[in-house]
């Protein structure tokens, strides 16, 4: 019902405000109450200033503002209150719309300046609890699967309030706030927490939710409320509703905080925003924030590192497997009811699954809109045809729970691959799956193929990286050896040392090409380099050939003898440096053969064994 205000706009008016003795179930927003109090106070002042002589036969100025034809009596105050609430109801913004109140209108502009208008945020159905219905008027439902309900009294057409929505109202009304778990005081945020706090004299908050829920519904025959299966489905649906309720509570807190800061924010944007504990406390969630202790605990929990890690992990999991579907608020059971009403035939579980994940090609229903769902369905079809034959009609035939169990590799994370939540858990067991297991290898999914390809690329990258590291180490060692030999040559008055060619380490049974070690075209003996020299060490698969036969055995230090050269002791009978007598380690002789100091070229030729008859054997007399 609408009424015209002074500006010509239509505004909704309340038809009933209840009896005078009954308490108001709706108090209105803060702005509404503030404006109402200001107008009533102004009305009393105007009535008092008019004097007793003006009360008879004359209307006051305040009464003219509210209702020109009404006398200034208590009834005028009631109508003024109703008019103010009607304006405030139109001006109050819904949370989802993000509108702001514009303050008082022209008639109350002066009064509104006394209290600046605040942003009015009103919530819908959050704290509205319907009274219990008579038994014959309650909605008839039937338990399905592990957490689903089928509404028997619904014909599958039109709009209806989802059953989980009604259950969520009961859960919020009987919210236990702070509970004790493991000796610690925490805010209830799991369905099991509802059972940790008593409600009344002989029950808990769980029993209160149970009573409130069955005040709106009744179970169909042959089920009764005493059946364990009914209790199992109720607990499963309540657990799911609590998770969704707490998830949306954080998003609501982020949305309200951002709007109070003057920023636009919706639920999708709030998913990626994490506030601090203080910022959460500055916001509100209507059904939760009035429990001050529980609200403060939840604000601290939402801002903790533990929650951030869990939130980011779950968000990445959802992004990796989006799980796009078209079930909407009806869910699987509601979608089946609408399909039955449209087609006149009760659909099978697979037909509902395909309808909820309908792909682009109607001629190929097995190709769905989501790759993950397509892979699950393909594995299910393979299992069904392997069990019942290649001509089995998998779409319209009876749903095979065992094939669905195998298609998902069991029940990872407690979820069945197809029909999770609508298939009773008692219809499949791990024992039946393993006893009837198939020897046929499972077809790898596209995600597994991507992971395998990434692992192969990583292994190839690691192999290339190791090869580069080895090459760098080889270059570094060669550079260090070159610097070491160059320093030794400068110390003993020799020209800069030229690094000899690197000879590849010969494979067993083969001899290296001695021509790579020959210098100036001289002809040497037929003895291979492997017979003449011992390797100093293998560097990067290559051998350095300039070390003597036993490079690690150093002779004792003698007087007037410089330290041994880094590449080992020089050939027998030769001096370590020019100007020193040659040393012969002959046993018992003690004689030293004086010989002229060799020049540098002779020393290098002998050292590198590049002369035709040079060898490591001592000279013969």
UniProtKB/Swiss-Prot annotation:
Residue ranges, compositional bias (Acidic residues): 82-102
Stretch forming the signal peptide: none
Keywords on record: Activator, Mutator protein, Repressor, Transcription, Transcription regulation, Transposable element, Transposition
Composition-biased stretches (Polar residues): 27-39, 47-61
Chain segments carrying region Disordered: 1-119, 428-447, 498-530, 549-621
InterPro entries assigned: EN-1/SPM (IPR039266), Probable_transposase_24 (IPR004252)
Gene Ontology BP term (one): transposition
Start-end of Low complexity biased regions: 570-594
Task of the protein: This protein has most probably three functions; the mutator (M) function, for excision and transposition; the suppressor (S) function, which inhibits residual gene activity of certain alleles in which inhibitor elements are integrated; an activator (A) function is proposed, because inactive SPM can be activated by a second SPM.
Identification of the protein by name: Autonomous transposable element EN-1 mosaic protein
Species this protein is from: Zea mays
């Amino acid at each position: 019902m609408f009424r015209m205000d002074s500006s010509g706009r239509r505004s909704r008016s309340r038809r009933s405000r209840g009896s005078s003795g009954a308490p108001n179930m709706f108090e209105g927003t803060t702005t509404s109450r503030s404006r109402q109090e200001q107008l009533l106070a102004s009305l009393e002042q105007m009535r008092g200033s008019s004097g007793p002589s003006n009360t008879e036969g004359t209307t006051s100025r305040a009464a003219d503002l509210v209702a020109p034809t009404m006398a200034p009596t208590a009834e005028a105050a009631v109508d003024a209150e109703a008019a103010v609430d009607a304006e405030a109801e139109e001006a109050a913004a819904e949370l989802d719309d993000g509108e702001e109140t514009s303050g008082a209108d022209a008639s109350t502009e002066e009064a509104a300046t006394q209290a600046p208008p605040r942003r009015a945020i009103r919530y819908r159905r959050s704290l509205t609890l319907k009274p219990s219905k008579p038994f014959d008027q309650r909605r008839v439902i039937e338990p399905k699967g592990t957490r689903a309900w089928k509404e028997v009294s619904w014909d599958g057409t039109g709009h209806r309030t989802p059953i989980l929505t009604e259950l969520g109202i009961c859960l919020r009304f009987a919210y236990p706030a702070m509970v004790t778990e493991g000796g610690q005081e925490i805010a209830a945020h799991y369905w099991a927490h509802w059972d940790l706090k008593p409600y009344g004299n002989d029950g808990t908050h769980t029993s209160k939710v149970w009573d409130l829920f069955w005040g709106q519904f009744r179970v169909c025959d042959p089920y009764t409320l005493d059946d364990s299966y009914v209790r199992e489905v109720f607990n499963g649906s309540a657990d799911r509703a609590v998770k969704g309720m707490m998830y949306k509570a954080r998003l609501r807190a982020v949305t309200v905080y951002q709007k109070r800061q003057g920023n636009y924010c919706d639920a999708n944007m709030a998913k990626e925003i994490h506030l601090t504990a203080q910022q959460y406390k500055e916001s509100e969630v209507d059904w939760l924030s009035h429990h001050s202790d529980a609200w403060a605990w939840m604000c601290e929990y939402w801002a903790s590192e533990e929650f951030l890690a869990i939130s980011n992990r779950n968000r990445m999991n959802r992004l990796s497997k989006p799980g796009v579907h078209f079930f909407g608020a009806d869910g699987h059971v509601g979608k089946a009811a609408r399909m039955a009403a449209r087609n006149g035939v009760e659909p099978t579980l697979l037909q509902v699954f395909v309808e909820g994940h309908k792909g682009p090609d109607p001629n190929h229903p097995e190709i769905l809109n989501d790759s993950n769902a397509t892979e699950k369905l393909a594995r299910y079809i393979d299992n069904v045809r392997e069990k019942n034959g290649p001509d089995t009609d998998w779409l319209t035939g009876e749903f095979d729970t065992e094939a669905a169990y195998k298609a998902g590799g069991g029940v990872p994370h407690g979820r069945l691959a197809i029909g999770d939540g609508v298939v009773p858990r008692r219809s499949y067991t791990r024992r039946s799956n393993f006893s009837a297991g198939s020897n046929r290898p499972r077809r790898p999914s596209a995600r597994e193929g991507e992971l395998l390809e990434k692992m192969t690329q990583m292994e190839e990258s690691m192999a290339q990286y190791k090869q580069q590291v080895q090459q760098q180490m080889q270059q570094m060692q060669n550079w260090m050896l070159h610097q070491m030999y160059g320093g030794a040559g400068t110390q003993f008055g020799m020209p800069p040392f030229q690094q000899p060619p690197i000879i590849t380490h010969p494979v067993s049974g083969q001899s290296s090409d001695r021509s790579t070690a020959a210098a100036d075209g001289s002809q040497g003996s037929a003895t291979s380099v492997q017979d003449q020299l011992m390797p100093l060490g293998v560097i990067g698969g290559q051998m350095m050939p300039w070390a003597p036969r036993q490079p690690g055995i150093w002779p004792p230090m003698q007087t007037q003898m410089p330290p041994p050269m880094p590449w080992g002791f020089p050939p027998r009978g030769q001096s370590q440096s020019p100007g020193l007598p040659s040393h012969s380690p002959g046993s018992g002789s003690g004689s030293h053969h004086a010989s002229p100091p060799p020049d540098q070229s002779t020393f290098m030729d002998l050292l590198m064994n590049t002369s035709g008859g040079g060898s490591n054997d001592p000279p013969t007399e």
